[in-house]
């Protein structure tokens, strides 16, 4: 099968995406597929006589790509392109994608995950992994997705929204609170705020990455994540951070300070099963298909709360879904192929 792995792009999570993309490329090549790795934003100018066919390879040569702990801004990323243009799709990206049997979306955050890329691929009838345009856009907006979850009686933290050049909203809950960009991921621009003095700087920082920020009530409890592949829930994974909380650095850089436990210790079986069902309920409410990840808080006192859904979960060595799949004996290459085959099966049902 000819597969394009689309990664990078223009997002604060660009570096995470590149790491996921290189790992996915290598994994699918080990399964015998012809794979082309393409950076959404930089594209490929096909210089020196290169052709689109020459970009594909089934030779699994693994490329190490360390995640830079620096969060890139749009200006930083725009400087990577020689011609200075800022359009989302780089040179020849669409032409390359048109030659594939399916595009594996290894994009994270921003325009890579908010439905824009999916919409363009839909226009050209190019198959791709993950959820469709509408579900991607809904889930990328934490505000909209939380409203949908609440409408469907799926527990999630209460919140208010803050905007640039607008008065700070009144909060119907006490400190501490969580401040985050409404459209973002990997905990970029996210803060735990303990008092009024910390609130304004935290909101201002979150608004550097988006024009809308959420102020959420802080839910005290253990943090879990649960992936779903082709309607099958994986075992939950518990995230234990030795110092601080599960921010960008803990997620992708300093893995030694974060402990992942799957299946979780001392999690009642009935709670684990309820978490699996709630993950499916959240996916269905948000319209997610193929694969996704749902994050939770739980304690005996508060019960289960959905934090958010993730339409294109990370696939780096420290990412959660690969670790959950491994518990079931699913190797990383098999996991990637399951995602591809699952999406093709969905498309064939239409």
UniProtKB/Swiss-Prot annotation:
GO cellular component: cytoplasm
A Pfam family reported for this protein in Swiss-Prot or TrEMBL: Dala_Dala_lig_C
Details of cofactor binding: Binds 2 magnesium or manganese ions per subunit.
Cofactor: Mg(2+); Mn(2+)
Classification via InterPro entries: ATP-grasp, ATP_grasp_subdomain_1, D-Ala_lig_Van_CS, D_ala_D_ala, Dala_Dala_lig_C, Dala_Dala_lig_N, PreATP-grasp_dom_sf
Subcellular location: Cytoplasm
Keyword annotations from UniProtKB, A to Z: ATP-binding, Cell shape, Cell wall biogenesis/degradation, Cytoplasm, Ligase, Magnesium, Manganese, Metal-binding, Nucleotide-binding, Peptidoglycan synthesis
Primary location group: cytoplasm
Reaction(s) the record says it catalyses: 2 D-alanine + ATP = D-alanyl-D-alanine + ADP + phosphate + H(+)
Residue sites binding Mg(2+) 2 per the record: 308, 310
Class in the EC hierarchy, top level: ligase
EC number: 6.3.2.4
Keyword Magnesium assigned: yes
Membership in a protein family: Belongs to the D-alanine--D-alanine ligase family.
Role: Cell wall formation.
Protein name: D-alanine--D-alanine ligase
Originating organism: Latilactobacillus sakei subsp. sakei (strain 23K) (Lactobacillus sakei subsp. sakei)
């Amino acid at each position: 099968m000819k597969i394009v792995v689309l990664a990078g792009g223009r997002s604060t999570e660009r570096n995470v995406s590149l790491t996921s993309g290189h790992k996915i490329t290598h994994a699918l090549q080990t399964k015998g597929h012809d794979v082309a790795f393409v950076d959404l934003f930089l594209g490929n100018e096909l210089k020196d006589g290169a052709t689109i066919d020459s970009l594909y390879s089934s030779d699994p040569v693994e490329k190490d790509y360390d995640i830079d702990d620096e969060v890139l801004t749009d200006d930083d990323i725009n400087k990577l392109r020689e011609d200075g243009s800022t359009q989302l799709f780089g040179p020849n990206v669409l032409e390359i994608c048109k030659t594939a049997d399916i595009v594996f979306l290894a994009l994270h955050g921003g325009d890579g995950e908010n439905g824009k890329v999916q919409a363009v691929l839909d226009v050209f009838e190019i198959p791709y992994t993950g959820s469709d345009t509408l579900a991607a856009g809904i889930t990328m907006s934490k505000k909209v997705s939380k409203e949908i979850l609440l409408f469907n009686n799926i527990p999630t933290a209460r919140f208010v929204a803050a905007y640039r050049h607008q008065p700070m909203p009144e909060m119907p809950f006490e400190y501490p609170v969580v401040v985050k960009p409404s459209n973002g991921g990997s905990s970029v621009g996210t803060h735990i705020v303990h008092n009024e003095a910390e609130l304004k700087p935290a909101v201002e920082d979150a608004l550097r990455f988006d024009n809308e920020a959420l102020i959420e009530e802080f839910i005290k409890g253990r943090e879990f994540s649960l992936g779903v592949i082709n309607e099958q829930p994986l075992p939950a994974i518990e995230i234990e951070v030795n110092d601080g909380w599960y921010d960008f650095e803990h997620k992708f850089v300093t893995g030694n300070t974060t402990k992942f436990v799957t299946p979780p210790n001392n999690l009642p079986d009935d709670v684990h099963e309820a978490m699996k069902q709630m993950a499916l309920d959240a996916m269905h409410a948000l319209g997610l298909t193929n694969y996704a990840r749902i994050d939770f808080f739980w304690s005996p006192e508060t019960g289960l709360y959905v934090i958010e859904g993730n339409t294109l979960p990370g696939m780096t060595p420290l990412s959660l879904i690969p670790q959950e799949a491994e518990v079931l004996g699913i190797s990383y290459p098999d996991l990637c192929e399951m995602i591809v085959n699952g999406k093709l099966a969905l498309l064939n049902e239409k």
